[in-house]
């Protein structure tokens, strides 16, 4: 594991990434925007660098609120992303028990996804356990499906325009808080613009 430290703009140093990757690189895992609220404008270039050496790119969607309706992981070429439903989709953390996650993968990784997967045969949905290339089952339980139902209802209720408005308000709130923090004597942020 190689940690890439931020450059003068507060995002991982792209030159450090170029120096770190090789034919032995398995993957890059990155969050965008960073937890500091800084957007990595070179995210597509990061993905291209890792793909050029045969690595995969995993997008941690922990801070997805600032991206709804503005950009998509697919647009940057990510191979896999996972969602923190309790952060971005109004589902309480744990939701009365162990959480249920959501992840998306590109077509070439689909056969490796943990079993079972939910499939549709044209008439009904079913759980598919017959996945010979899968990493198998991760837990004895299925998580808490209510988290997924809440997430689905949240997305359907808001629709595309509402989801984009969430992103716009998230960015506005982040910038407002940044300005307010910088008004406090003794507080500075190394990457504040």
Indicate residue ranges for each PLM-predicted region:
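Active-site C-terminal subdomain of aminotransferase-like
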Residues: 80-193
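Conserved PLP-enzyme active-site core in the AAT-like
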Residues: 1-122
């Amino acid at each position: 594991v190689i940690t890439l430290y931020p450059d003068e703009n507060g995002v991982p140093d792209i030159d450090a990434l170029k120096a770190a990757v090789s034919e032995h690189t398995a993957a890059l895992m990155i969050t965008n925007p960073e937890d500091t609220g800084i957007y990595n404008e070179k995210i597509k270039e990061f993905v291209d660098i890792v793909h050029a050496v045969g690595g995969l790119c995993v997008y941690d969607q922990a801070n997805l609120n600032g991206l709804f309706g503005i950009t998509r992981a697919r647009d940057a070429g990510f191979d896999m992303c996972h969602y923190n439903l309790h952060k971005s989709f109004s589902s309480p953390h744990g939701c009365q028990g162990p959480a249920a996650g959501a992840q998306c993968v590109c077509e070439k990784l689909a056969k490796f996804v943990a079993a079972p997967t939910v499939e549709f045969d044209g008439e009904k949905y079913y759980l598919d356990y017959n996945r010979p290339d899968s990493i198998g089952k991760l837990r004895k339980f299925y998580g808490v499906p209510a988290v997924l139902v809440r997430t689905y209802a949240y997305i359907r209720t808001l629709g595309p325009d509402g989801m984009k408005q969430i992103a716009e308000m998230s960015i506005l709130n982040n910038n407002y808080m940044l300005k307010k923090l910088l008004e406090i004597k003794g507080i500075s942020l190394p990457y504040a613009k």
